[in-house]
């Protein structure tokens, strides 16, 4: 369970390094699509540089954020799985948590700002999450979500201040290096 001021989702300070990213890649590999890397034909003319595009829009939820969400979900203890997970998001992270938690039978509650675009809200619900609309912005929704996770003793999956999430998202870098050494 996340405690305020921690960054690895387990209540400890850690560090993201190549080893943790490689471990994440091994952990999530069976459930994440290795997206293609395409050389842009137009952008080099505008930037005077070679530009490659990593097509993460082809992931199940349409964004790279699910890599980190899945990595964190796969590191949950049995007790954390039973308690369910809580996250705060304005869209992509929440969809990743919702999809991968639901796929594994883990209850997911996603807190989103009241003014979240309908397409993000609808997709998060469609992936199986209980969505709570709260606050005027992400920070307000996140603070309330953390408070609820502490009350319920549920794991909080932070979208960016969690080393396990960051390592999962970092797996995109390993793919980039493999695809374009």
PLM segments and residue spans:
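PLP-dependent amino-acid enzyme catalytic core
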Residues: 5, 10-181
